[in-house]
Amino acid sequence: MDALLPRSSPQLKFYLNGTPISLTSPHPRWTLLDFIRSQDGLKGTKLGCGEGGCGALSGKHVITIEGLGTVDHPHPLQERIAQLHGSQCGFCTPGIVMSLYAMIRNAYDPVTGKFQLSADDIESKGHLDGNLCRCTGYKPILNAARTFIEDDLGSVPSIVESELVGTEEETESDMGAHSGSGDTGSRSSGSCGRPGGCCKDSPGISSCSSRETDMTTPSLPDSPVLKQYDFIPYTPTTELIYPPGLAKFVPELLCYGDAEQAWVKPRSVQEALEILSQCPSATLVTGASEVQVDVRFKDFRPSVSVFVGDITEMTGISWSEDMKTLYIGGSASLSDIEAECLRCIPLLKAVNLGSESVLSAIARTLRYFAGRQIRNAACLAGNIATASPISDMNPLLLAVGATVHARTSAEETTIPMSEMFKGYRKTALPSGSLITKIAVPMPSKDQIEIVNAYKQAKRKDDDIAIVTAAFRVRIAPGPDYTVQEASLAFGGMAPTTVLAHKTASALEGKRWGDEAVLDIVLTSLGEEFNLPYSVPGGMATYRRTLTLSLFVRFWNYVNQKLGLEYDSDLIEEIHRGISTGTRDDDNPHAQRVVGQQIPHLSGLKHATGEAEYVDDMPPLHRELHGALVLSERAHAKILSVNWTPALERGAVGYVDHTSLPEEKNHWGPVVHDEPVFAKGEVHAHGQPIGLVYADDAMTAQIAAKAVIVTYEDLPAILTIDEAIEARSFFNYGKELRRGAPPEEIRKELDDCEYTLSGTTKIGGQEHFYLETNAAIAVPHTEDGSMDVWSSTQNTMETQDFLSQVTNVPRHKINARVRRMGGAFGGKESRSVPIACIVAVAAKKARRPVRIMLNRDEDMMTSGQRHPVQCRWKVGFNREGKLLVLDADTYNNAGYSVDMSAAVMDRCLTHIENCYYIPNVWLRGWVCKTNTHSNTAFRGFGAPQAMYITESIISAVAEKVGIDVDEIRRRNLYQVGQRTPFNQVLDEDWHVPLLLEQVREEADYDARKKEIERFNSEHRWRKRGIALIPTKFGISFATALHLNQASAAVRVYTDGSVLLNHGGTEMGQGLYTKMVQVAAQELRVPVDQVYTQDTSSYQTANASPTAASSGSDLNGMAIKHACDQINERLRPYREKYGEDADLGTIAKAAYRDRVNLSAAGYYKMPTIGYEWGNYSENVKPMYFYFTQRQGVACTEVELDLLTGTHTVLRADLKMDIGRSINPAIDYGQIEGAFVQGQGLFTMEESLWTRSGQLATRGPGTYKIPGFADIPQVFNSSKGIGEPPLFMGSSVLFALRDALSHARRERGVSEPLVLDSPATVERLRLAVGDDLVHRAQVQRKDGEQGFFVAVA
């Protein structure tokens, strides 16, 4: 490389939002994200997972969210996302906006001046499969995107017209929240004001072509429902996409770096080979999507990185003259390959069906390869060279006989794919070689050659494979359909991608279509892939089943092509349709402001990237960055900690348990049993040992990884079963009982006509808020006070423990939070130690200290929803009437109590759900294990409890042979009956009515009959439906002291209002709702009321924003304050008239020395339950159940061959009384449903045997995406935690589908379906012959690779 250095340049030149950038020797470890966020005013681009990479930017134009628009001058897309309620917490919104922007701009045809965009393009082409949102349920985002569909491609779908709702009254001036609307004429003329530049600032430059076209999208099609939305028209030709300076850009050989790492960007293959000849171990990158994961999670540090993504010789895609070979450049993007295949399929279909088969297989495989952003950057050569055993593309390349062309400085070699893989992550590529192209042969047009490829993952879109397969078969012409040649390739079945040689040989020479031949193949595959129970990656039986199932799918596919008998269910995978749905927007209680569908007050800030989260705050003078040192053992003694290597790598200092007194080193929301810093012993993988701090975040991370900790391992308990066996419990000891006393409950069971016993398990759930835990501690050396910004739901607890660890009185600690990028309970307590740790560091360093956890750090340290196991016995009669329930319920607390006891409280009090059982004895156990400490999560133990009940109901229905809906109906609570904790269900108990309403409105009975018909006609596709009720108690249950709130309202003499309260904004729209309350009470527009942030200085002793009580508590406190002010202003309203504005009234009152500020306070009345008090006079535990009851009706379709499913329709109905803001409440119910859908079907947390969390990033832990939401999504109002359990209706609908399948196959054993109902569990529960063939027996002492801790 020395010879190249004199010819190289260290300058990286590109454009950023229209501005030329020239960087000299940038940091070689920087990603594009690192650079963008280091620039002033460019914080809209967020760190979501840290698993992507940037490649190189030389000669590119980078557009960020700030380059599209601002709050004052938003891009039409940004405005529509905000106005149509497409954001809640807003952290994901900039990324989603940019993905939509790319889709919309690419859909623009400069020749016709039209947007070639349809609903199918938006939902089915993968444009959004790399984006995740945890809050909204995706529906409003899709609605906003659909407003760009033009009339000539079909009008905006009816879903938009039915959901972009409102009344003309909402556009009046007192609805100031509609700040995005305005005079569209003035806003679309002249410069658009975009920071990235506008073409009207530079006349004559067109963004798409030299042809000037003034094309704008209509605001929306004419519709009386939509006329209130005066959206900004979209004029794409006003956007500067290609800066003129790029036309003059001359590529240079780029080389920069430091003593540890160099980054090189050659211009040609020859330059790349010269580099490799001198540095044969250099790391080649194009998208860096694989390398960056190793850098982030495996501490991989390439000494030389060579970017080959812009070498023209390697990015092309071409055909041989005879069209018999497709040549794919090694660096050609996967998106380009997909596009080329789609372009050629119709051209070749008429002349060469074999070629069409190959190209279709490639295109289909690439469609579900990662996400769109990855496909735009990643290349095929990288896929081959990394040699992943679960590669999507390698089995297909192997099956079709592709060859790899590789060059070194000395020679060019051609390697057949069949000889490429030599071992796990090892290839036959020569040292220092470069893959220049891949040759994909096409079948001869006179041959009958059929190819297809398959992939099975936990989720359809953007997921790594469990098993991949590709099959090719050549059939001899003639009526016998003799197999001349076969190739069967699999990924996920061995350390490398492999060919099933034995099976292929057994197939060759046989007659295709003969069922006996199919049996031979299946037997041979079972022998060839005989996985052990302990196979790395786990799922041994499921993976073996898939090898058989996927071949059966191919067998039927070939039969169809040959005109033989086939089953269509076995050919096509489940494909979802375009999503639709309705909302019931009748709101008879709407007032002038309260009850109106006002957009989230920060919606435009979210959509433009201007919303500021903790880590977006500008850097402070002399600020330091922290990085945690975490335990790498589940349970061990700490023998020594050597901090010296960290200091040598650039750390300024560190803190650990020696940095604060022993008595200050323990915290906990209830019991102070958790060390802030581990001392002497660690009790979980990921437990904080210390923190190093440095001048920048990257140095801090490197230094933290350099710390050497020596351990002595101790036995670890991971699962609930292990905790029960070891009697490892925290002190809890609570129970609930009704009817027969405990000593007689067993006799009552024996006296029942029927009894059943069982064990029900439900796994945990990662919060997966998009903004990880973050905090900034700012010490004030003058007086010892401290400001701490934290992403927390709980300013009071944060303040309390900050005071403890810094030894500073609470009145000198100001805990502050402006907004969170999601929380869901996960930042009620687990944010506290993060703030405490940086505060200790800030006090020691006497400088501000900042931290934002990486995704894996956050997942390892922050805890999850509690895994729960219930061991139950139930007694009932032949009519299915429940009589007795005797149950032990266990939750996995982790290594500290945190809020696990309170979670168990709610679990026990919701375990009967909506059903009256006269005799119950319920006991709770809180298990102590060596996993991270589990914590609050939306629902707080109730979803797990209600799932147990519904599982019991299903088991009872199966036992007595009565329809499960009838069993539910017969056991429903009636008005006047009492819960096991003696709370009366009064006249507001509406669940029986809601069930009947949903049954009628969802056309349930007719659909159930149609499902019976469908299932009778489809052996390998089954549909199911479920109608699930729920109730949820509102209040902080037995933490009575938390059921209070205070607020401060200050009126200024111009009529503006400052509002402070203790509630925190995490995306649930609390700030918006509270502003509405104040605006309603003080009779002002919402834009006259301002809430800056939540601060312990402004609102002392604030209860956490949790338990679905934020609006109830804080809203009433605000009303109390406003009532006081209104009473003081009453004489002035009488004097000046009811129509007088608040400014006039306030000014007059001020001159009369009237106090224009008030402190409000509210405590929730009537509650105060005492555990163990079974008298009928005991105070209620919950303030109410009414207005938070709900019913969900969900229909699914299940592919029995793979376990994949789709949600065909969901109808949700909740009684929430008088909604403050229906639009926000809709977002809550739909988002909660999708989150619940994830809990019960997809989100599976797994640990390694050593106690390390295996699912600690989006690559291994999957939450629902855009393609997972119900295809028809109908909802009525809801809010907060209660709607989450409605997501269980998906699982019970799947259970219904499985029941049909099992009855058809004669499976008589009771169906046990633990949660989550993953593709693995669903497939294996079918109980068919393929599963029996593939069954892997567990040998004595053999353990599974992963551990599920429920």
From Swiss-Prot:
Annotated PROSITE patterns: FAD_PCMH
Binding site residues for [2Fe-2S] cluster 1: 49, 54
Keyword Kinase: no
Binding locations of substrate: 828, 906
Cofactor(s) required, per the database record: [2Fe-2S] cluster; FAD; Mo-molybdopterin
Activity's dependence on pH: Optimum pH is 9.4.
Inducers of expression: Expression is induced by nicotinate and 6-OH nicotinate, subject to nitrogen metabolite repression mediated by the GATA factor areA, and strictly regulated by the cluster-specific transcription regulator hnxR.
InterPro entries named in the record: 2Fe-2S-bd, 2Fe-2S-bd_dom_sf, 2Fe-2S_ferredoxin-like_sf, Ald_Oxase/Xan_DH_a/b, Ald_Oxase/Xan_DH_a/b_sf, Ald_Oxase/xanthine_DH-like, AldOxase/xan_DH_MoCoBD1, AldOxase/xan_DH_MoCoBD2
Disordered: annotated span: 164-193
Residues that coordinate or bind [2Fe-2S] cluster 2: 89, 92, 133, 135
All copies of domain FAD-binding PCMH-type, residue ranges: 256-445
Cofactor note as given: Binds 2 [2Fe-2S] clusters.
E.C. numbers: 1.-.-.-
Composition-biased stretches (Low complexity): 180-192
Molecular function in Gene Ontology: 2 iron, 2 sulfur cluster binding; FAD binding; iron ion binding; oxidoreductase activity
Keyword Metal-binding (UniProt): yes
Homology family: Belongs to the xanthine dehydrogenase family.
Role: Nicotinate hydroxylase, part of the hnx cluster involved in the purine degradation. The nicotinate hydroxylase hnxS accepts nicotinate as a substrate and catalyzes the first step of nicotinate catabolism. HnxS also accepts hypoxanthine, but not xanthine, as a substrate. The major facilitator-type transporters hxnP and hxnZ are probably involved in the uptake of nicotinate-derived metabolites, and the oxidoreductases hxnT and hxnY in the further metabolism of 6-OH nicotinic acid.
Name of the protein in question: Nicotinate hydroxylase hnxS
Species per Swiss-Prot/TrEMBL record: Emericella nidulans (strain FGSC A4 / ATCC 38163 / CBS 112.46 / NRRL 194 / M139) (Aspergillus nidulans)
The organism's taxonomic lineage, starting at the top: Eukaryota, Fungi, Dikarya, Ascomycota, Pezizomycotina
